[in-house]
Each structure stands twice: as C-alpha cells, then as structure tokens.
Amino acid sequence: MCAELIGTAFADRLYKKEYEMIQENILELVKYGLSTGLVDPEDKVYTINRLLELFQVDEIEDAVFEKVENLPAWTQEEAEGKLEGILAEMMDYAYENGLMAENSIVYKDLFDTKIMGCLVPEPSSVRKTFRDLYEHTSPLAATDYFYKLSCDSNYIRRQRIKKDRKWTTDTEFGTLDITINLSKPEKDPKAIAAAKNAKQSAYPKCQLCKENEGYAGRVNHPARQNHRIIPLTINNSDWFVQYSPYVYYNEHCIVFNSKHTPMKIERATFGKLLDFVTQFPHYF
C-alpha cells in the first residue's frame, strides 16, 4: 500500500513537471514568434490560446508565465537557435500524451508543421504586406520579407538546410556549383507502410498546387499549415510564387500556374520568365 502511494505521488509529480514544461514551451514558442516578427504583439494572447487548444492544455499557470516573461529578450539569431529544441520538447509531449500517432520523422514533420501554423499570419495578411512592400519600398524588400517569413515559419527548415553539402569546382565550362541535399528526410518503414495503405486522394493534385496552402497533410503528402504563396500576373494569366522548402540554391523560387497543368518548355515559357524577372529584376 505504501509503495503504491509512493508510486502515485511520483507519477503526479512527473505529470505536473510535464504539464509545466509544455506551458513553458508554448510561451517560448510565442516568444520566438514575437522575436522573429511572425507574431504581432497584438496577437500574443490569441496565439497562446491557439497553442493551448492544440495541446489540450487548459491554462498557463501564473508561476510559469512569470518565469518565461522574465527571461531576457531574444535576438533573431538567438531565436533561430532555440526553435529546434522547443519543437522537439513539444513533440515529445505530444507523443507521450497521445496527440501524435508515431514518434517518427514523418509524423513529427506533420505535427510540428501544425504547431508552426499557429504562428504564421493568414494568407491575406502576408499578401497585403508583400504588396505594400513591393509598391511602396521595392520588389527586393517584398521578396526579402517573404523569404524570411518562409524561413521563420519553419517551412524552410534552417537547421536541416545547414546539413547540406555544398562546394564549387572549376571546369572547362566555368565554375560549377555542386550540392548534396541532405535536408529532405528519408521515410521510416512504418511511414512507408502507412502511406501504401492510406486512402488515395487527389487533393491537392500535386505538391505545387495552390491548394497546398494551409493543408494539414497526411502520411503520403506533406503538411503545409505554415506555407504561404503570393499571387502574380504573368503574361496576363494567374500564377503564384513560393520558395522551395529544400533550397537547392539561394532563394530557390518556384513559380507555378494557378491551374494544375502539365509542366513543359515551349516558346511562351521564355516570355513568362522574362515577365517574371521584369517584375523582380533582382532575380535576373
């Protein structure tokens, strides 16, 4: 009986520690959002509450709030360095409390994208900021904002990109850039089996379609709650621009049609390319 009581008391203390830790993680993640500019100060409480809902936590205790609030402010660089650790602890909590089906890379990517989606401004807000910067400052300022947002949102995973191997070599045709991309994770056997058995869906039709923006994902399709796209008019037709999450080269842009159409190179392709670089001359 005594041992049973001791075991219960230990379990209670362990649960309380985990409960306090997830509250700290939530506040630290919001602090990250504020430090990087992802979260507007006016949206701080709203963002905290969205994360509480996601983790099925009812409150932020006063002691936890004071502990995190009293921490020194973070620079952009400091915030970037803390994100991976914060998300790792959040996913540990999610798995241990039944919020994440498997503790594997595929399920972690699905869940941490869902977490980051709570911090990213709505598409209309991102597009308005982009247009304002383009019209009143410069095209460069607009793309700088959009690229930074794509990184800060963890859509472009900075910590994984750092693992890529890059070097140059001189050839008879000039200097050649060589990249070995290590940032795209390999699926584990369980995820491969789950993807094989998953219900097939034609939505979104491909990983570049506009319907990916905000999509929750599944084992055979990446989550995109933290993904934003910018509408463009190219050669009098509707297009979008986004950045590649794998960054095969600096500020790797993807410009795609608003309709799901086959990719092909034809005479009109070069006109579209010239129209794009006319609008964004710094990408020429």
Regions found by a protein language model. Name each.
Residues I265-P281:
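Long, well-ordered alpha-helical scaffolding segments within enzyme catalytic domains
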